[in-house]
Amino acid sequence: YVRTLSLLQDQVPPRPWAEMRPVIERELGGSVDALYAEFDREAIAAASLAQVYRARLHDGTDVAVKVQYPGVAALVRHDLDALRLLVNIWAKFEQVIDFRPVVDEMERNAPEEVDFVHEGQAAERVAALLADRDDVLIPRIYWDRSSKRVLTMDYIDGIKISDVDAQRAAGIDTPRVADTLIDLFNTMILERGMFHADPHPGNLFVVPNEVEGEPARIGLVDFGLTKTLPDEFREQ
């Protein structure tokens, strides 16, 4: 089950370009050819809500363009309604395990996860909180090429964090990567009070350092689900 469901991280069968191009052009108000100097029509990753393309801006910057599937907000609402019905039925027969709070949390998060403006703003806030760390990469957002359903950001050229063999082949110290990842999330949660709340392998990359001998960095993407913790909660 884990192996099969893990495909949802970034290996969902992609939607055809003919279906996704109109989303970009409608959201950004121009043709793809005018908006970007280059745009690869083949998606480099596809997940449950959107798929990602590689492109290049007119100034030569390599970017990733995240495009939401048409009609996904309505589908999410339909799925949540179905889940609500199921957990309400479950609650009539099961008194020990109550799944209703889980669906409550999903319903609170859903509007933010399908709003890429929220995602971009969250990425910028976390980047500001971690600006003193040189072991993490968070993509810059290009707001003139972004909207609620399209998000253009720096392309992070990294190795999926679960691909340990590729990391070792690149000469990366994998135990040190693990230490960095733990320290990074401890910093976000316990010190800075805002953290990336969806750290599955499709959202975490290991980026070899350009400086020889320096440790690899952690690349974080997809800030659609972030959480903020009050000071009092963190202190407790």
Task: For each feature predicted by the language model, list its residue ranges.
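Conserved catalytic-loop position in the HRD/HxD motif
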Residues: 193, 198-200
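Broad phosphate/nucleotide-binding scaffolds in NTP-utilizing and phosphate-metabolizing enzymes
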Residues: 1-188, 193, 206-231, 235-236
